[in-house]
């Protein structure tokens, strides 16, 4: 969590190991050719979804949902029995994303609509009707004890194969849990073709995963993000009021990376309703998702971002990306 005193949890724990419990979470690495070159083929090219990262933790026959930072996600009973049934008698953790399927639709809602509802689950304000719209796509399965330990040595190919088998046993009628769309690729060229195909269809991209990769509580070098646009999560350190017709509304947010090295003002991407609403709220210290074209030096010689655009407030995160993870 953010300690509100100029240091984060990881810094405190470097001084006194284990002082503050940290929630386990394996992250993907942003695209770097040197990392991609180390991927062993055949590998998995999996569709990158636009939902909310979550864990379904099944223990002692009960299920709870947590965000990537360990905050409880309230779904008012939705999906609990489904995950308990999938787990059987095993204590385990399902890793994936929550998505929203609106009534009458046969496809998932767009990111803004879906995450608007999912953020309510994160805040504990979701209604039963909204919770019933939530579905899950999953891509990993980790034994509970190894999840808590922060390391599972079983290769991803074995973990995912087990997950595929148990998810496939669900009845087709009314199912709400799905395996992530996944393709086994023999070469990097095949992965790039799938990536370009998804972009053309309006999806975000792929995660390329090495089948030999272990699960570990850190940023993995065996799971690589391929994205059409660059994206990062920054901390809001200040806000600016709009000018002219935008007086009395949010004009821009001033953001920084976790280490304060990357700094940028983000003024585009907000609609009028958001500008009015956010000006009433205390946005300072919140985490925000920003898309951009490239990392640059500004006129003052500081690291910044070219063409930054607001995407959403990340209520599921407490800590921004470090500058080394912003390409």
Model regions and ranges:
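Short aromatic-glycine-enriched beta-strand elements
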Residues: 243-254
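Intrinsically disordered, low-complexity regulatory tails
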Residues: 108-125, 130, 134-135, 261-327
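Covalent nucleotidyltransferase
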Residues: 38-175
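Amphipathic alpha-helical
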Residues: 7-26, 178-230
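Flexible glycine-rich surface loops and low-complexity tracts that mediate binding to linear polymers
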Residues: 86-104, 209-210, 238-240, 283-302
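Short, acidic/hydrophobic/Gly-rich beta-strand patch recurrent on exposed beta strands
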Residues: 252-258, 267
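Charged, flexible boundary elements
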Residues: 17-47
């Amino acid at each position: 969590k953010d300690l509100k005193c100029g240091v984060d949890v990881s810094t405190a724990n470097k001084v006194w190991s284990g002082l503050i419990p940290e929630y386990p979470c394996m992250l993907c690495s942003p695209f770097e050719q040197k990392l991609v070159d180390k991927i062993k083929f055949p590998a998995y090219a999996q569709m990158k979804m636009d939902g909310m990262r979550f864990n379904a933790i099944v223990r002692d026959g009960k299920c709870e949902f947590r965000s990537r930072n360990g905050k409880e996600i309230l779904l008012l009973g939705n999906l609990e029995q489904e995950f308990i049934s999938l787990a059987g008698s095993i204590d385990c953790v399902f890793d994936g994303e929550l998505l929203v399927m609106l009534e009458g639709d046969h496809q998932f809602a767009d990111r803004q609509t879906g995450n608007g509802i999912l953020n309510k689950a994160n805040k504990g304000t979701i209604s039963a009707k909204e919770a019933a719209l939530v579905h899950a796509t999953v891509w990993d399965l980790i034994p509970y004890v190894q999840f808590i330990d922060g390391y599972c040595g079983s290769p991803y190919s074995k973990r995912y194969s087990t997950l595929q088998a148990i998810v496939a046993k669900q009845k087709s009628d009314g199912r709400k849990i799905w395996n992530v769309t996944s393709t086994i690729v023999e070469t990097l060229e095949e992965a790039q073709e799938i990536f370009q195909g998804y972009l053309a269809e309006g999806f975000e991209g792929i995660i390329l995963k090495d089948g030999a990769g272990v699960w570990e509580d850190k940023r993995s070098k065996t799971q690589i993000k391929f994205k059409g646009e660059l994206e990062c999560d920054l901390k809001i350190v200040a806000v600016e009021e709009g000018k002219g017709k935008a007086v009395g509304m949010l004009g821009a947010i001033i953001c920084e990376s976790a280490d304060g090295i990357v700094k940028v003002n983000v003024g585009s991407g907000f609609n009028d309703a958001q500008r009015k609403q956010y000006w009433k709220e205390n946005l300072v210290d919140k985490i925000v998702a920003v898309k951009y074209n490239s990392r640059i030096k500004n006129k003052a010689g500081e690291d910044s971002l070219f063409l930054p655009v607001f995407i959403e407030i990340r209520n599921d995160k407490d800590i921004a990306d470090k500058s080394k993870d912003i390409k």
